[in-house]
C-alpha cells in the first residue's frame, strides 16, 4: 500500500487483505464503470443491522419506536458524512472531472455513500463479527451520547417547539454573509428570538446547516440561561 492509503486504514482501524476492495469503495460512479454502489448497498444493510442489534442489547427496556428513531439518527446521511470527514475521506475519493470541479469530495451524499461502501468492503474482506467491531468502534461516542425517549428532532424543530410551548414568537433566521465559491461556500445566519439581547450566530456549508447551528446554540442559551 502507498503511504496515503496506509494513513486512511489507520483512521478506519482496519487493514485490508484485498486492497482492491478499498479502492473500489472509494470509487464514485463518475470516475469509473466499476464503482462503489454495490458495496454501498451491502454496507447500508450491514450498518442498519449492526446498529439495530447494538441498540436492542444496549437498551433492553426501550420500545420499538424509540429504537427506530435512535437508529435513524445514527445511520442517516449527515451522520455518515460526519464520519467520512473525521476519516478525511474526501482526500481519497476517486471522482470524475465534473464531480471534482463541483467539489464532490465535500458533498454529504458522496461521503455518506463512501462510508457505507467501506463497511461493505470490510465485510467482504473479513466477516460479520469483524465489521461489527469496526462499526461499533466508529460509533462509540455517538452510541454513548444517544438516549431513548430524547427527541431525535433537528435543532430548528426543537427550538420552534420550545418557543411554542412557552407561547413565544417563532425565531427569525437571516442570512448575513455568504463567502467562498459556489461549490465551497460558508453561510452565516443570525437567529433572532424575542427576549434575547442579541441574535445568535450560526455558520455552515449551506443555509440549512447554518440555521441548524444557530438554532442549536440558541437552545443551549435558552435552556442554560
Swiss-Prot record:
Pfam families: dsrm, Ribonucleas_3_3
Positions of Mg(2+) binding: 40, 113, 116
SUPFAM superfamilies: dsRNA-binding domain-like (SSF54768), RNase III domain-like (SSF69065)
Subcellular location, principal: cytoplasm
Molecular function terms, GO-annotated: double-stranded RNA binding; metal ion binding; ribonuclease III activity; rRNA binding
Catalytic activity, reaction form: Endonucleolytic cleavage to 5'-phosphomonoester
Any one cellular-component term (Gene Ontology): cytoplasm
Keywords: Cytoplasm, Endonuclease, Hydrolase, Magnesium, Metal-binding, mRNA processing, Nuclease, RNA-binding, rRNA processing, rRNA-binding, tRNA processing
Domain RNase III, first and last residues per copy: 5-127
Entry EC number(s): 3.1.26.3
Needed co-factor(s): Mg(2+)
Stretches that traverse the bilayer: none
EC category name: hydrolase
Active site: 44, 116
Domain DRBM: 154-224
Family, as annotated: Belongs to the ribonuclease III family.
Its biological purpose: Digests double-stranded RNA. Involved in the processing of primary rRNA transcript to yield the immediate precursors to the large and small rRNAs (23S and 16S). Processes some mRNAs, and tRNAs when they are encoded in the rRNA operon. Processes pre-crRNA and tracrRNA of type II CRISPR loci if present in the organism.
Assembly behavior: Homodimer.
Protein name per the record: Ribonuclease 3
Taxonomy of the source species: Bacteria, Pseudomonadati, Pseudomonadota, Gammaproteobacteria, Vibrionales
Gene: rnc
